[in-house]
């Protein structure tokens, strides 16, 4: 989910007709016969603005795969910084969290509006600073299939292939590869890790780092219904309909006028507007569809949602090392679901370092507290340093100061809000064994 939920990326209306939107832009259309090309094949390219000083950016249209197995094409933006060596490549999955192609990262780069995203510039800059080249894919695909993890994972893996295939990027064919994503971006990264051994076994992947992971779409939908994050539920369901014909057909049968209008509206805007439009909405009621609170138990719905649950299939166990981080009191993405996926992978032989943030930073704060540590961990893997053997569960407190273990990154991210009274209150609750609320709940203390 887009953890900077107060940012609205709906820029199409502001830009007007001067720049074509992806649906009307010929650059996004693959050539005739593209279906026979191998996944990761590059069809066209164009330069764009990176929004970062000294960083060059080029967009490539490449072949990838839809959830139904058919061929499609999507766009990725390749970033090369002054420190990029050509020996390391990281796929960055931004938290798009929407079902509108104007919300895709490629459109932000093309229109020069990357500053409208709170994460795109800082995250990619941090990765570029390690000497890696970064590829930022529109992993949802041309149908904006938000929350359809398998399709997103294939889109990310094919972006790595495309970057390697694009010779002007200057990447070594033996470059060390990795991926990073948080929240909605962790759907794509987690599924890329799961599918890589079978879908893209030739890729030289050295590690994956992701956090705030919606490992179970069903539990995530249930968690945000009726809350200030309810917009994610509606856009997530709309994304399932965009990916699965069966889901769209079933919703057409059971939707009310209000439900159809909500899905239609979600398809015209980005995550910030979704959160505003659907504040406190509960899609699991008869206001939106005739099944009411039985919606997620409907066989057609269960089928597609189960297909998006990480860790259920032993054959999809990641083989490259993983760094997962999640806030114990994440108010958006259920902690237990992410932990369950990690445990399942570990039981099947994966190497996972699962970091639990117990300091009460919540969904947003955990990203700020541990994102830098995750990127540092990933850089160690790409640099050839092996992780500690096997799986480990690491606890973190002090508002994001991680406890150390062999093989962990040396960087320490310290996150705080500067008020000793707030810190003391959090420590008091923690010591008493009580839940520590997210930082936003303390807003009244500092306003």
Identify the role of each PLM range.
Residues 13-85, 447:
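Catalytic-loop region of hydrolases
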Residues 78-80, 86-98, 102-110, 208:
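Short beta-strand element of the alpha/beta-hydrolase
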Residues 119-123, 146-169:
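Alpha/beta-hydrolase active-site loop
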Residues 161-232:
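Primarily recognizes the serine-hydrolase "nucleophile elbow" in alpha/beta-hydrolase
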Residues 211-315:
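Accessory cap/linker subdomain of secreted extracellular hydrolases
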Residues 299, 303, 339-447:
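C-terminal catalytic histidine-bearing segment of alpha/beta-hydrolase fold enzymes
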Residues 318, 322-330:
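Short beta-strand/loop motif that positions the catalytic acidic residue
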Residues 328-333, 364:
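Acidic catalytic loop of the alpha/beta-hydrolase fold
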């Amino acid at each position: 989910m887009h953890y900077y939920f107060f940012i609205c990326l709906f820029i199409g209306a502001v830009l007007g007709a001067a720049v074509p939107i992806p649906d009307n832009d010929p650059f996004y259309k693959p050539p005739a016969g593209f279906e026979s090309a191998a996944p990761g094949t590059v069809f066209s390219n164009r330069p764009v603005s990176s929004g970062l000083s000294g960083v060059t950016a080029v967009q490539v249209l490449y072949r990838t795969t839809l959830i139904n197995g058919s061929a499609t094409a999507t766009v990725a933006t390749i970033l090369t910084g002054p420190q990029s060596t050509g020996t390391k490549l990281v796929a960055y999955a931004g938290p798009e969290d929407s079902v509108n192609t104007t919300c895709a990262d490629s459109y932000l780069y093309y229109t020069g509006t990357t500053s409208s995203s709170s994460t795109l510039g800082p995250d990619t800059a941090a990765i570029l600073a390690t000497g890696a080249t970064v590829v930022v894919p529109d992993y949802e695909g041309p149908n904006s299939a938000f929350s359809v993890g398998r399709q997103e994972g294939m889109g990310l893996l094919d972006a790595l292939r495309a970057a390697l295939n694009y010779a002007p990027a200057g990447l070594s064919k033996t470059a060390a590869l990795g991926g990073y994503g948080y929240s909605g971006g962790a759907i794509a990264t987690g599924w890329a890790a799961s599918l890589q051994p079978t879908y893209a076994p030739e890729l030289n992947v050295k590690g994956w780092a992701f956090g705030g992971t919606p490992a179970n779409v069903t539990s995530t939908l249930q968690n945000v219904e009726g809350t200030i994050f309810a917009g994610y539920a509606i856009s997530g369901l709309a994304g399932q309909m965009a990916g699965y014909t069966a889901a769209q057909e079933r919703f057409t049968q059971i939707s009310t006028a209000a439900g159809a209008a909500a899905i239609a509206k979600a398809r015209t805007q980005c995550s910030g507007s979704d959160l505003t439009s659907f504040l406190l909405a509960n899609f699991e009621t008869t206001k939106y569809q005739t099944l009411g609170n039985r919606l997620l138990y409907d066989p057609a719905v269960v089928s597609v949602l189960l297909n998006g649950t990480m860790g259920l299939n032993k054959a999809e166990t990641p083989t490259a090392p993983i760094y997962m981080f999640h806030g114990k009191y994440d108010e958006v993405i259920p902690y237990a679901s992410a932990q369950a996926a990690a445990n399942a992978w570990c039981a099947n032989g994966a190497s996972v370092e699962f970091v639990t943030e117990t300091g009460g930073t919540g969904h947003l704060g955990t990203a700020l507290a541990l994102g830098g540590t995750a990127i540092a961990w990933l850089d160690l893997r790409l640099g050839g340093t092996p992780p500690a053997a096997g799986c480990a569960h690491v606890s973190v407190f002090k508002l994001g100061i991680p406890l150390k273990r062999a093989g962990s990154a040396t960087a320490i991210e310290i996150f705080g809000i500067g008020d000793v009274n707030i810190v003391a209150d959090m420590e008091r609750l923690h010591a008493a064994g009580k839940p520590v609320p997210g930082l936003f709940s303390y807003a009244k203390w500092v306003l």
